[in-house]
């Protein structure tokens, strides 16, 4: 039997409720710009850097010619970058399927096919797998799969403290003008909270994962449940031990 004191209404009322994730990100980027949005072993990313990288990657996706509602897949090891990628897809108005970093070729192929992905957003190497070589093999059997995106071309792994988006080629801050240009390019593309935003890959009963369709409201509702059940405040620092971007890692980590 678990006995705990129910959180007081005043405590719950003090925790913001958001209409979408972008509202939360923009709020913390404005009010806590240098505080950490995400922390990983290699480094930490501030709220401002997180917000800027999301816009830059969303603009990059848009520049590739993907229409709103296009389907993509995210195959990126857990860490700051995968969270940027998920938010960037929503900001760019494309539907993403999350693929676990430990997935083998058969599972990746299955999820790309089931998710009808036209684009694979990934990193050059996952474990011992050269993702470019794998992409070339997969596209031979998946005619819809046409684009390979190296996320590190836009969003590098943070080393130490990152307080602003950096140019991966030079290591220098990209600057406000580049971010403003990215925001202008993606204006009006954001996926509405009540429309399909992602396909969550999770364990199936046939030896291959299944895909569960979600809109953005699933995060907002889960946030409310977590705040209410745990009497959480805005001072909490949350540790996720469930890998993203799939399964319960989507519920707890992002």
Language-model-derived ranges and their functions:
Residues 1-18:
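Flexible, non-catalytic linker and terminal segments flanking ANL/adenylate-forming cores
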Residues 13, 17, 26, 34-79, ...:
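Conserved AMP-binding/adenylate-forming core of the ANL superfamily
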Residues 16, 33-34, 166-201, 208, ...:
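Conserved pre-ATP/AMP-binding loop-to-beta segment of ANL
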Residues 25-26, 62, 80-99, 109, ...:
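Hydrophobic alpha-helical segments in the ANL/AMP-binding
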Residues 72, 89, 196, 202-205, ...:
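Conserved S/T- and glycine-rich ATP-binding loop of Class I adenylate-forming
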Residues 74, 229-254:
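Conserved AMP-binding loop of ANL adenylate-forming enzymes
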Residues 75, 120-121, 199, 241:
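Short hydrophobic segments within beta-strands
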Residues 92-169, 173:
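Structural core segment of the AMP-binding/adenylate-forming
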């Amino acid at each position: 039997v678990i006995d705990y004191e129910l959180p007081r209404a005043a405590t719950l009322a003090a925790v913001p409720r958001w209409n979408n994730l972008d509202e939360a990100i923009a709020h913390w980027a404005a009010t806590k710009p240098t505080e950490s949005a995400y922390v990983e072993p290699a480094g930490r990313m501030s709220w401002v850097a997180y917000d800027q990288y999301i816009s830059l990657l969303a603009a990059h996706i848009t520049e590739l010619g993907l229409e709103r509602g296009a389907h993509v897949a995210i195959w990126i090891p857990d860490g700051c970058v995968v969270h940027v990628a998920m938010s960037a897809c929503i900001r760019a108005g494309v539907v993403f399927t999350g693929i676990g970093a430990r997935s083998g070729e058969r599972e990746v192929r299955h999820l790309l096919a089931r998710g009808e992905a036209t684009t694979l957003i990934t990193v050059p190497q996952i474990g011992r797998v050269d993702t470019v070589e794998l992409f070339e093999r997969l596209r031979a059997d998946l005619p819809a799969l046409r684009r390979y995106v190296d996320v590190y071309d836009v969003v590098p792994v943070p080393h130490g403290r990152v307080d602003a988006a950096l140019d991966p080629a030079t290591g220098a801050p990209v600057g406000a003008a580049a971010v403003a240009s990215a925001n202008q390019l993606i204006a009006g593309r954001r996926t509405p909270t009540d429309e399909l935003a992602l396909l969550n890959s999770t364990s199936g009963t046939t030896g291959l994962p299944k895909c569960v369709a979600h809109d953005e409201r699933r995060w907002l509702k889960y946030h409310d449940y977590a705040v209410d059940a745990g009497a959480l405040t805005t001072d909490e620092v949350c540790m996720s031990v469930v890998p993203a971007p799939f399964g319960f890692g989507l519920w707890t980590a992002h």
